[in-house]
């Protein structure tokens, strides 16, 4: 089931992390995906992310390459370089780059709706949260609750 209220959920996450003074790490492979999907708005997104104190763009560099090699070697040694994933080998290598960057930058949680990325991240000990699992701001949650209650009352009246 796709997430609803995606923008509000993400904005609430960013606000919450900013209040806690937690940097939001964006691995460059993930940034490339976002910018590709954003098309014309990509340049504006990049400028905002790059200028914001809340975000830190992290490149795939030497430490991440070493971590990626370690992760891949362990998967190969286990007899399944794909670790049971149905993704293409290129997709798996791409997702492992993201996980390797997260690992060397000491990230605790990965936020993603990508099922394969989530599985790889969990194997490496990360908490994984999907957009659907992100809470709405409290006022939105209250409004949703009120709407649900009103809707249930209306259904009861109709019976």
Regions flagged by a language model, labelled:
Residues 32-37, 118-121:
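Short catalytic/ligand-binding loop motif for oxyanion handling, primarily in non-cytosolic enzymes
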Residues 2, 99-159:
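Acidic, PIN/NYN-like endoribonuclease modules and their adjacent C-terminal/linker elements
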Residues 20-24, 54-56, 105-109:
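Short active-site oxyanion
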Residues 1-26, 35-52, 139-159:
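Short, well-structured N-terminal submotif of metal-dependent ribonuclease cores
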Residues 29, 88-96:
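Short basic/aromatic active-site micro-motif
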Residues 55-88:
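Acidic catalytic patch
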Residues 30, 64, 97-98, 116-117:
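Alpha-helix capping/helix-boundary segments
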Residues 26, 59, 93, 111-112:
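Short beta-strand scaffold positions
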């Amino acid at each position: 089931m796709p997430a609803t209220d995606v923008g509000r959920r993400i904005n609430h996450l960013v606000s919450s992390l900013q209040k806690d003074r937690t940097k939001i790490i964006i691995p460059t492979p993930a940034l490339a995906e976002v910018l590709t999907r954003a098309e014309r708005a990509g340049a504006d997104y990049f400028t905002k992310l790059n200028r914001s104190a809340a975000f830190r763009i992290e490149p795939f560099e030497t430490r991440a390459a070493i971590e990626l090699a370690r992760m891949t070697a362990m998967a190969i040694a286990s007899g399944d370089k794909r670790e049971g994933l149905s993704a293409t080998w290129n997709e798996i290598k791409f997702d492992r780059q993201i996980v390797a960057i997260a690992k060397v930058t000491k990230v605790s949680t990965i936020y993603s709706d990508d099922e394969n990325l989530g599985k790889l991240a969990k194997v490496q000990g990360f908490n994984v949260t999907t957009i659907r699992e992100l809470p709405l701001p409290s006022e939105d949650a209250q409004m949703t609750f009120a709407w649900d209650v009103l809707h249930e009352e209306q259904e009861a009246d109709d019976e």
